[in-house]
């Protein structure tokens, strides 16, 4: 595979009060928050619109399972289906099955510390 990760897709973290945290970041750091957190838009080297998501989540979310970590990183990738096969061949733990939505494909792995990592093959144009 030529490329694996092409950029940071998002940072997700647990907090006791996501709305309070979003309001604090909006007031003091100027983040333009919505129900999901904050989306940062940027352009890749080819000039395509891309996004990175910042999302505080409820402390009791099960989305990070099987990891017990209070955060989860999301990486933008190319050719997720092939990448998941290659990672499995390399002995990496793949969590669950790949899921496809109108805004991209998602897959999950665990790093050596047991942190769940989300891999996203985005369709940014669907988010514009």
What positions do the PLM features span?
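Vicinal oxygen chelate
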Residues: 1-10, 36, 84-128
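Core segments of cupin and vicinal oxygen chelate
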Residues: 2-6, 12-54, 89
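Generic anion/oxyanion-binding catalytic loop in active/binding sites
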Residues: 10, 62, 69-72, 103
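Short secondary-structure boundary micro-motifs
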Residues: 25, 57-60, 82-83, 90-94
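Short linear motifs in intrinsically disordered
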Residues: 29-32, 74-76, 96-99
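Conserved short beta-strand elements that form part of the metal-binding/catalytic scaffold
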Residues: 30-68, 109-112, 116-123
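Mid-chain, well-packed structural core segment of small domains
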Residues: 66-87
